[in-house]
Amino acid sequence: MKRFASRVLPKSLLVHRANKHAIMSFAESVGLVYFGHVSQRDDDDQLIRGLTLSTSHRDRHYCVGSLYNYDVALVERSDTIHYPGKQPRDHQWLIMQFDLHNAKDLPHIFLGLHTHSDIFYANLFAKFTTLQRAPLGTFGMYDRSFTDRYAIYTTPAESLTVERLFDTEMTKVLAQHFGTLTVEVSDGCLYLYSEHTRITKGLLEAMLQNGIWLAKHIDERAVVL
């Protein structure tokens, strides 16, 4: 019967069902509450914000809870990115948000992959006009395992603060464990993004583990900056 169903159902629906099962299973195992679909017309407090927030995005598999002393939210978000002179491009993100304790005054920071599309970065810089690539290396040489994969973007006036926060040793560890995850710090929250089409419980567990580690690091470092 399952083989017959897989022949009949569209691949996109099969992926959606598998992703839903993975997220619900993960949520149950760690103690998150699963709400499913969230409309943009709902209370703004329920929305996961960050750089992917738009007037056209669609959210599903929304989960919330408190884990390891952090308020955590999870959502699968899809959107079509438009930019003048470029072909529209569909994006789908798995987003995990952590409410930070000591980072209310930190600048907007994005750790982006070099492999992001041109339209993604064009849209990002149009939306956040103060973001620029930080010139790393003031306090030491960054490991190539990090710089070959990531660049850090922030407001130019805050680049030294960002280098102290994301220093050479910390970014080396990040490069070893984060794979293709990207990172944003904005308005007192930490966001981890994955663009894996197929969501697995292992991916979700890795995002949670890495997110808690990074949130603790940011909170500890923010106190002395």
Language-model regions, residue ranges each:
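Terminal, regulation- and interaction-focused segments at domain boundaries
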Residues: 2-18, 25, 196-198
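Charged, low-complexity intrinsically disordered regions
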Residues: 20-225
